[in-house]
């Protein structure tokens, strides 16, 4: 594909030299990239009588289906000149696959890890359970195996859905997940509690999310599908750089135009990958995904709008404007939009968020408020190592309540790094970045968490 054709696909219909140069500038100077091409694979056909046989079937299925994924993505990168940062796989929630098996589900986690490494992908997600209305024997067994599974593998990611707007919040699962997070941290204490960076606790999880660590291949999905997650915070920041004095509705209009171009890129890459791999094209996830590099920050976009630093009063409103404009621009560019589709605010993966935590401009309470707007929730936040399991469960319950009451996906991915106190810094390496340890509320909540049971669904969740 020639660069003028690529430029036209982004919305530069005049195919002018300006459009071509603008495209090149977005890629080279403003870090426009495809954050992930994720292949979703159904493993329902892999269930066998024993865990060992199931693990073998899972390995064979993943390696055969994804054999050409990395090769195809690298070919598209060379052809278009646009980086595809990650190639990933999501699979059917493993608690469903192992429901009829005797044995230890960690065997399947290790098979997934080996399969992912053998085909060359960065991560594989789906060591997951869906327990918003209660857990089966298989669900409970998998949840209790998560600390070992994530601490003894390198690229396997896990998630648990504990709530939905139709079912309410499963507080028994919330209580359990606080303990699981603490155990996972303890088992990887010599590696900055890295297992916790691969574990997400959801409300209203979705089965077509291409982003890690919360990706899994939903049971409503086909046998195999390829989806795309875009990036491009730098492109949006650049678009707003010339708007000094503009009104906020003008700012929103400019964000929509930038989101259109970013999403068009994702749709083009997804369509090419789908055709070359011979599998259906799933969705483009519109989420703006930052990195810890300078010029690739969602927080910086909010500051370009006029905030002296993210975290001050007005931050949630600025994030609402950004999130809505990204969705509107992206939906005009692609008819197959899905996943989480909004703005990610992971602390360790966003230079602006890291700086705000360092200076005390943003607190965990403000981060919680922002999650009422953004795609995910309390994401990649390092907290003190002595934080009790009940406090973590309280964070999960609060996030689930926001998601359930607002019919949106929310999640918690916090990392209680053993031996750390507020102000320490933790380096997770690579795309996961680094983060200052943020203070948390130390007032107790254990009686509330230990009550268990369910928080009922809201009345507006009953829509039939």
Curated annotation (Swiss-Prot):
InterPro entries: UPF0210 (IPR007841). It holds the Pfam family DUF711. CDD domains: RNR_PFL_like_DUF711. Belongs to the UPF0210 family. Homodimer. This is UPF0210 protein Cgl1545/cg1743. It comes from Corynebacterium glutamicum (strain ATCC 13032 / DSM 20300 / JCM 1318 / BCRC 11384 / CCUG 27702 / LMG 3730 / NBRC 12168 / NCIMB 10025 / NRRL B-2784 / 534).
